[in-house]
């Protein structure tokens, strides 16, 4: 039963919201433009603000939904984390799109809002601060992912620490950094575009 739920978690994550936005709004394949990502940032740059907001909310919802399902079924922390990871993997490597999906940020946010809304909101706060200061989405995304494990650790007190939650925060951080490796190179070179730039 739990393995079946992992499969459905992957299917939730692999729902191609950004790809569908491109096809419906402009008849384009968003994967062929810009970063090639199906995430909200690439949608914003090549389709528009309204489509980007919808894609962002749908991607967050995918993460939240998978964790809420796990909690509804009274699954323990380890299984909640496993389902969250399967959803994140589905978002990054969707079978429907030849394994080419998003960069794990919005769906990752949804997963951590589901696991611990306080951690999710605090991590979102880091993103908002960085995007306000620098107006570079990738910098804000990487900064928030780096802060995530520390925020998760600080959210627990004493013996109340959930090892699965800490592990998944580290894995999510690594996935986000890996998916942004090209952005990081451009950041180092000072060539990463800000919001409003192509």
From Swiss-Prot:
Keyword Cell inner membrane: yes
Subcellular location: Cell inner membrane
Signal peptide: none
Molecular function terms, GO-annotated: acyl-phosphate glycerol-3-phosphate acyltransferase activity
Bilayer topology term: Multi-pass membrane protein
Keyword field contains Protein transport: no
Entry keyword set: Cell inner membrane, Cell membrane, Lipid biosynthesis, Lipid metabolism, Membrane, Phospholipid biosynthesis, Phospholipid metabolism, Transferase, Transmembrane, Transmembrane helix
Enzyme class: transferase
EC numbers for this chain: 2.3.1.275
Catalyzed chemical reaction(s): an acyl phosphate + sn-glycerol 3-phosphate = a 1-acyl-sn-glycero-3-phosphate + phosphate
Pfam families, sorted: G3P_acyltransf (PF02660)
Alphabetized SMART domains for the sequence: G3P_acyltransf
NCBIfam families referenced in this protein's UniProt entry, alphabetically: glycerol-3-phosphate 1-O-acyltransferase PlsY
Family of the protein in this entry: Belongs to the PlsY family.
Assembly, per entry: Probably interacts with PlsX.
Protein name: Glycerol-3-phosphate acyltransferase
Classification lineage: Bacteria, Bacillati, Cyanobacteriota, Cyanophyceae, Synechococcales
